[in-house]
């Protein structure tokens, strides 16, 4: 079963909590026990799992990734000027597996699932595939 969500990001770089969208898809699927794959089919966006209780964690992650891979590097050769976004996306990855048990998405107490925007604002697709266990 495949679900697709559209997310309009608002900033050049952001982390959008998509946990509830994924939980909603799990409920709609009616599956009790399943394997779940979440993917973003983009080369300048990614997915990550991280703390969702304190918004400062997201801010710190974005600040630190910008420090590691600065947006502006005059030695980049890619004509579009977004090589930084491709690299950041590659570091995070575009697909993550999850488990559904007793009809619920299994996450740790503080875990949330984030769509990471590195070349926004843009309209992004989030693909949620739910497979019977």
Where are the language model's segments positioned?
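Active-site histidine-anchored catalytic micro-motif
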Residues: 1-133
């Amino acid at each position: 079963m495949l679900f697709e969500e559209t997310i309009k990001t608002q900033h050049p770089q952001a982390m959008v909590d998509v946990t509830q969208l994924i939980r909603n898809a799990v409920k709609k699927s009616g599956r009790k026990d399943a394997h779940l794959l979440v993917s973003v089919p983009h080369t300048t966006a990614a997915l990550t799992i991280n703390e969702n209780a304190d918004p400062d964690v997201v801010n710190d992650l974005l600040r630190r990734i910008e420090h590691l891979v600065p947006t502006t590097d005059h030695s980049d050769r890619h004509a579009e000027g977004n090589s930084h976004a491709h690299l950041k996306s590659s570091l995070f990855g575009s697909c993550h597996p999850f488990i559904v048990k007793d009809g619920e998405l299994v996450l740790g107490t503080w875990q949330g699932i984030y769509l990471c925007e590195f070349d926004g604002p843009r309209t992004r697709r989030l693909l949620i595939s739910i497979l019977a266990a």
